[in-house]
Amino acid sequence: MADFLGMMKQAAQLQSKMQAMQEELGSLEVEGISGGGLVAVRMTAKMEVKGIKIDPSLLKPDEAEILEDLLVTAHGDARRKAEAAMQEKMQAITGKLGLPPGFGFG
């Protein structure tokens, strides 16, 4: 019975920590860059795009395809950084609770 109560307490702690982490991920921002800094995408760790910066040298009609490719690359870079930030936060939470690595998280 004590083990069950301990597990319930641990589950409640995990739920509380997860809620706090979700709030923190919404405010944590990363920036993906491509083209040597010509294009940057800023997004939250919850994958919400917050801003895009484009160097004026790319704003030429005949450069549209290059710009499109750079935007896709910068977004991918930002997404990878956001996913890494999310994994780091998850590991910090599960480690503090003494849960095994990868405990129920993808």
Curated annotation (Swiss-Prot):
UniProt keyword annotations, A-Z: Cytoplasm, DNA-binding
Key word Lipoprotein present: no
Signal peptide: none
Disulfide bond annotation, renumbered to this chain: none
SUPFAM superfamilies in UniProt: YbaB-like (SSF82607)
Regions that span the bilayer: none
Subcellular location: Cytoplasm, Nucleoid
Function comment: Binds to DNA and alters its conformation. May be involved in regulation of gene expression, nucleoid organization and DNA protection.
Subunit structure, as described in the record: Homodimer.
Family the UniProt entry places it in: Belongs to the YbaB/EbfC family.
Name the UniProt record assigns to this protein: Nucleoid-associated protein BBta_7345
Organism: Bradyrhizobium sp. (strain BTAi1 / ATCC BAA-1182)
Source taxonomy: Bacteria, Pseudomonadati, Pseudomonadota, Alphaproteobacteria, Hyphomicrobiales
